[in-house]
From Swiss-Prot:
Reactions it catalyzes: O-phospho-L-tyrosyl-[protein] + H2O = L-tyrosyl-[protein] + phosphate
Active site (record annotation): 111 (phosphocysteine intermediate)
Name the record gives this protein: Putative tyrosine phosphatase 197R
The organism of origin for this protein: Invertebrate iridescent virus 6 (IIV-6)
Keyword entries, A-Z: Hydrolase, Protein phosphatase
Length: 266
């Protein structure tokens, strides 16, 4: 193991400052030789995540015991992912895999040199799984694996905040018709806000009805207008902020975004 740790790869989850070495589930680093693959498998690595383009210089394809546990997500060297939606789906898949690892199983993420691309993925996973800031995640992962400025900026963007104004495609006030079906009656509203007002006006007045009503209407809006739903998914892991109603709209949008991502095929 000394041949790998500190040279070719490092543990990143749980974080090095938390738990014992036996608790570690995920590693990241450089493109492994076949001999290093055998060594990684001997310490419990079952999943291999390859971030290279597949034809990069000075890389030789390797063989693992279970081909079904080999995952690829190509990112150009020193670059960032081009498609945020596909990237979030990929990260969610890794989160599910890591969360389901048994005590003796591990996952290894690698690029070519074991610096920028694999470090970016490791830092993103820490932000999601440990709910830490990009600054802290970068600090945890760049000591041995420095990332490029563009990759650090991408991480800050991915977990930044975004305001929802009245003209936003995410807002109930945008000019997008919404069709609401209540029983056998189908009603067309000029906007989601009109639909919310109508439903509230005809409600029984329960305390939590407003939140449920806004969520119901926005869900209908996003499902009926793919461009709005696409815009929501493009926000990645960003915090959504709206001044109205103690940010209930932002909270609802994040909830719906998570729901849509869970329903997407990975």
């Amino acid at each position: 193991m000394d041949e790998l740790m500190g040279k070719t790869c490092s543990y990143f989850y749980p974080r090095p400052t938390l738990g014992s070495l036996s608790d570690k589930k995920a590693l990241f680093g450089g493109y492994p030789t076949q001999e290093q693959v055998y060594l990684l498998e001997s310490i419990g690595v079952e999943w291999f995540v390859d971030l290279t383009l597949g034809n990069e210089k000075r890389t030789t394809p390797y063989i693992i015991q279970n081909k079904e546990k080999y995952i690829t997500f190509p990112i150009m060297d020193q670059r960032v992912p081009e498609n945020i939606i596909e990237f979030v789906k990929f990260i969610n898949k890794l989160v599910n895999i890591i969360s389901g690892l048994t005590d003796c199983e591990k996952l290894y993420i690698h690029c070519k040199g074991g610096h920028g691309r694999s470090g970016l993925i490791a830092a993103t996973l820490l932000c999601v799984m440990d709910e830490i800031s990009p600054e802290k995640a970068i600090k945890e992962t760049t000591l041995s694996h420095p990332q490029t400025k563009a990759q650090c900026n991408f991480l800050h963007y991915l977990f930044g905040s975004q305001n929802i104004n009245n003209d936003s495609l995410l807002s109930p006030y945008s000019h997008h018709q919404v069709i609401i079906v209540c029983g056998k009656t189908e009603t067309v509203f000029k906007s989601a806000s009109d639909a919310v007002y109508y439903l509230l006006h005809n409600s029984s007045g329960k305390s939590d009805y407003f939140i449920r009503c806004v969520e119901f209407v926005l869900d209908n809006k996003f499902q009926q207008h793919p461009s709005c739903k696409q815009q929501l998914l493009q926000t990645g892991f960003r915090q959504l902020q709206c001044r109205l109603g103690q940010n209930c709209i932002g909270t609802i949008c994040i909830k719906l975004r998570n729901k849509y991502y869970n329903n997407l095929e990975v």
